[in-house]
Amino acid sequence: GGQIYRDVDRAAASRGHILGADYTDGRRLTGDLRQSGVEHISGAVVWAIEDEFRISYTCEERGAQIEADRILLATGALERPMPIPGWTLPGVMTAGAGQILLKQSGIVAQGAVLVGSGPLLYLIAAQMVRAGTPPAAMIETQTLGDMIRALRHVGGALRGWPYMAKGLKMLAEIKRAKVPSFTGATQIAVEGEGKAEAVTFTHKGGRRRIACETVFLHHGVVPNTQAARSLGIGHHWDAAQSAFVPELDAWGQSDVAEVFIAGDGAGIGGAKLAEHAGRLVALKIAQNAGHLSTQVCNRLAAPPTPRSDTGTGRTPVSECCLSALCGRVKPCKQHRDLPL
């Protein structure tokens, strides 16, 4: 997890004006972590969690193990796969991968085409505009019908008006940069001989073709549940998000004793909700370990409340944004082989 703050201590000074205040705010958390005295092993890859919570990982090309009494998983989210014809061609990657290039290396693809839907697509487009390298086009899959259906969440969205204001600001940045936008696109495909050379799609009844060498795909995010599943934690289907989420109580404790989950790995809610969820889990772990009484734990936990208003791990405003921008992931009615 933690992709929103990736490399924040190093990149904030040089690229903070491009990545925005939500990104640079991560220095507050990394600063608190350094002052806490907690041992922080960065750049590690965990590849096994065995009996008695023996964790095997690799760091700086060396293997190591550590044992724990309790485990807190904060694995974050994964981008939902968007398999379209040509998606395996060199030059095609997820929008999140494009953002990682910007955060870690300051690299912005020239003339890239953004394809899909979701708030992250607008964020990356706005960041590319600020970097002086706007996308060649945005090809969006959400329809007018999706926007209309999202109106039922407008009350919750207004309660979270600062988020709406941020979204409107991003849209204004993209519009001022005159980035071509095509909403309600269908039959999207990437063309090319050995690499991406163009994106073709249907828009308002006509076929269009935009030449490009880089394509960023995005169709929302889902919880990264690989570690949770490997531990045997129960999961259930979240119909609103069209994804499996782990079975957790209000504090983030799973049905496997002494395993807790916080952040988007527990259900998509964004960075701020993840931060609050992490605090709740930390309090519960401290209580279970005998360092806090139940009364003190409950007092420190409120507010925020253990769960959001929707009961799904998402805030009212995120419900509105996800519904409007992503629509509902529609099940395929007929299977057919596609040229990939």
List each model region and its residues.
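Residues forming the flavin
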Residues: 1-340
